[in-house]
Structure formats: structure tokens, C-alpha cells
């Protein structure tokens, strides 16, 4: 009940806050010192994140509320953030929930239902998820099996693939509804992997697609591949955290690529972006590989600003990302951000291993 009251008071007070047209979404997995560093933040680091948000006047809202308001062109409070967790790991209940409940902050858990059904060691159980749902926590769909949904099985036709993936998403929705009463229309792609074909299935089912590439949300965002900033031990220091939560969406209006496609999943040769005007320094726009290596950028046209990013260097099998950023015109330390993801198969046409 205290969590409900605190949440209601927080939502009631936002109408008096300065308005904004964007938000940032954070994604965590484990909050623990015992789990893999790649998908974990320590409880101490998590505390520092929450303290930063509170001390710097951020408003934490439910992700579904943020998405609906942005889609409808409504204003959000200044410095709006959503907090999400993927996979429904136990530490969300034991470590994150008490801390967020104390502050009266909402959050979302994207649940892979098979792990809960089978009682996988690090997963929450249904009784804990019901308790969280009863406390106002939003439970989103993260598929049933947490499989690489973009991948077809050997000799699997497109029709068979669509049926299998559709059933996987539906099963998770049915289990969430039956066990917790949740009927969220938020779907987080397992591993953050998506393709146009998978996005089409997600759209047909009436979901918003939630990805894992970095960036802020705005009204021009792709609502079938909404970005989130991943938080892990490698990315959890406060300086990097502050850069993430203060970012803004780079106003990309069109995207085209050369080389990469979702049939062969080949290396990307060129990324071309068209951008709307905004409060960013276009002359300082830069693009980088996920490793931080800078990429060559060529201005194709000034009005509207269109750039070509040449993708050089090795591209081994796996997930790849390009981050494009530009500093804000006036606010020091604030960056407009866009991230592009693509997938590459192995040379023999097989898929990479996690």
C-alpha cells in the first residue's frame, strides 16, 4: 500500500514539472555481486544510480506511460527516466524492489516465462511476480523461451518461422495473464535482437518493441525498436551513467544501409542517416563503433542534413552497433544520441554463439 501511495503522489506531482519531449530508458538484468559482470551491476552501484536520479531532480515514470505520451505528442516532465529489468532474475526482487519501493518509483520487468515455469535457479517464481504486480510493477513480455527469435531453424520456411515465433510470444503473454493478470503491450526482444520481419510480428500483435541499443526516446523514435541504455559493471560508473540519463534523441528521420540485410546477415558497408533540425551542433556530429573506434562521416546534403557513415574494419559474427552523437547547442555535457544495430552470421552461414 505504501508503494501505491508513493507512486500516486509522484504521478500527481509531475503536472507541475517543466515539460520535455523525450525520455531515457535504462535496462538492468542482475543487481548482484555474484552474477556475470556483463549483465550485472552491484547493489552499491545501483544505489548510486538511484541517488543520482533523485539528487538531480529526475522523474521516474512507468515505461508504458512514457511511450503512450510520446506517441500521442504529449509533454513529459523534464528529465524523465524509466527503469526496466530483463529476464525476471531473483535479485530484482531481493535487491532492486526494496530500493525502488522505498522511493516510490515505478519500474518494469520483462519476463521470460519458461524460466519461471521451470524454476531456473536465478529466476523469480510466480508468487514473487504476483507480489510485484500487486505492488504496481509492470510485467512486460520477453518471450517464452528467450530464444534468438530472428533466427530460422535449419530448413525452416518463413511461414513456419513466423508461426513458431508468434506462438512463443503468445505463450509468454498467456502465462503472464494467467499467473499475474498482466496484459502489458510492451515486448522486449531477447538479446535485443530484431529484424524487420520480427518487428512486423510484434506490430501485428499490438506490441511496442523494446530493444537494447543505446539512445533516448522521442516522438520520432521507432516504436518497434525503442532504445534503452544497458547498465552493467562496465557501464555503471556515475560519469557514464550521467551521460546516459541526460542524453536526448538525435532526430533521425530516415535510415538506409548498404551491405547488411536480414536475409544473409552480411557485414554493413555504409549507414546513411537523414536528420531533422534540432538543438544540437551538427558540425560536431560523430559516429563510432561500439568499441569506441571513430568512423568516417561524409555530409551528403545540408538541407535536410544527410550523412554517410563508412563502416570499415573487421566485422566478426555477432551483434554490431554504431553510435552517432552530437553535443547539445547550449547544455554542456548533454549529447543527442542515435544507435544502429545489425547482426552478422558466421562465414559458413551459421549463427554465432552467445
Name the predicted role of every residue range.
Residues 1-79, 101-107, 112-124, 130, ...:
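Terminal accessory/targeting
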Residues 171, 176-179, 203-214:
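Catalytic-core region of carbohydrate-active enzymes that cleave or remodel glycosidic bonds
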Residues 199:
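Catalytic cores of alpha/beta
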Amino acid at each position: 500500500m505504501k508503494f501505491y501511495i508513493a507512486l500516486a503522489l509522484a504521478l500527481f506531482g509531475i503536472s507541475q514539472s517543466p515539460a520535455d519531449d523525450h525520455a531515457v530508458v535504462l535496462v538492468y538484468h542482475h543487481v548482484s555481486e555474484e552474477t556475470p559482470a556483463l549483465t550485472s551491476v552491484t547493489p552499491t552501484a545501483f544505489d548510486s544510480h538511484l541517488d543520482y536520479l533523485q539528487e538531480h531532480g529526475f522523474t521516474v515514470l512507468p515505461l508504458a506511460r512514457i511511450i503512450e505520451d510520446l506517441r500521442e505528442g504529449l509533454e513529459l516532465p523534464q528529465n524523465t527516466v524509466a527503469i526496466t529489468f530483463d529476464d525476471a532474475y531473483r535479485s530484482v526482487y531481493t535487491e532492486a524492489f526494496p530500493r525502488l519501493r522505498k522511493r516510490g518509483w515505478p519500474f518494469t520487468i520483462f519476463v521470460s516465462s519458461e524460466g519461471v515455469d521451470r524454476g531456473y535457479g536465478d529466476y523469480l517464481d510466480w508468487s514473487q511476480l504476483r507480489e510485484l504486480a500487486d505492488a504496481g510493477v509492470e510485467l512486460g513480455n520477453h518471450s517464452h523461451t528467450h530464444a534468438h527469435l530472428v533466427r530460422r531453424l535449419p530448413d525452416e520456411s518463413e511461414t513456419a518461422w513466423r508461426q513458431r515465433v508468434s506462438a512463443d510470444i503468445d505463450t509468454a503473454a498467456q502465462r503472464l495473464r494467467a499467473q499475474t493478470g498482466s496484459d502489458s503491450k510492451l515486448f522486449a526482444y531477447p538479446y535485443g535482437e530484431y529484424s524487420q520481419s520480427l518487428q512486423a510480428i510484434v506490430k501485428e500483435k499490438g506490441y511496442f518493441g523494446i530493444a537494447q541499443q543505446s539512445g533516448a526516446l522521442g516522438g520520432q523514435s521507432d516504436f518497434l525498436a525503442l532504445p534503452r541504455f544497458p547498465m552493467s559493471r562496465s557501464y555503471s560508473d556515475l560519469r557514464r551513467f550521467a551521460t546516459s540519463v541526460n542524453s536526448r534523441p538525435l532526430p533521425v528521420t530516415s535510415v538506409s544501409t548498404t551491405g547488411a540485410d536480414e536475409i544473409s546477415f552480411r557485414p554493413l558497408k555504409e549507414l546513411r542517416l537523414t536528420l531533422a533540425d534540432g538543438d544540437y551542433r551538427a558540425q560536431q556530429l560523430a559516429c563510432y563503433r561500439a568499441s569506441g573506434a571513430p568512423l568516417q562521416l561524409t555530409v551528403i546534403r545540408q538541407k535536410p542534413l544527410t550523412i554517410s557513415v563508412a563502416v570499415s574494419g573487421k566485422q566478426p559474427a555477432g551483434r554490431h552497433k554504431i553510435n552517432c552523437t552530437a553535443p547539445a547547442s547550449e547544455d554542456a555535457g548533454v549529447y543527442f544520441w542515435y544507435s544502429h544495430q545489425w547482426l552478422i552470421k558466421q562465414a559458413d552461414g551459421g549463427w554465432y554463439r552467445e
